[in-house]
Amino acid sequence: MESMGLTAVGFVNEAAIDAAVRRVEDLFSPQVVQIQYTLENNHYGDPAITFRILVTDDAAHDIDQLYELSEKISKTLTNEAHTYEIGLDAHFSYRTVSEQKKLPDPMWK
């Protein structure tokens, strides 16, 4: 039986979320460089997960292409991590590699 970790948002199987994130990274490689997440409560105090998706500059070159990619990634992450089934409100933040170089943020490593 896998252990369930108690987090600020309750009982969440972080190993299952980690595995889902790695699957989505692999699925969308090479456009996706890295996906990270944070478990927290949203501004209403409800359990939430915020995904930070780092994409290549090429993936973001065309706004329509980026929109389509972000929609696919968001839906796939939600489905793979079963966020709604486990009671987590999913949020998504996207950044390009060049943006990260200009605006270094430790949350984005």
What are the functions of these language-model segments?
Residues H43, D57-A59, S98:
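Residues that cap or initiate secondary-structure elements
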Residues E85-K109:
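Polar/charged, Gly/Pro-rich intrinsically disordered segments
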Residues N13-E25, A59-I86:
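Short, non-transmembrane amphipathic alpha-helical segments
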Residues P30-V55:
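Short edge beta-strands and adjacent turn/loop segments
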Residues E25-S29, G45-P47, H61, K102:
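Short acidic, gly/pro-rich beta-turn/loop elements at beta-sheet edges
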Residues M1-G5, V33, G87-H91:
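N-terminal leader/presequence segments that precede the conserved core
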Residues T7, F11, N41, Y67:
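Short, charged/polar micro-motifs that form catalytic or ligand-binding hotspots
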Residues M1-I17:
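N-terminal presequence-like segments and adjacent domain-start helices
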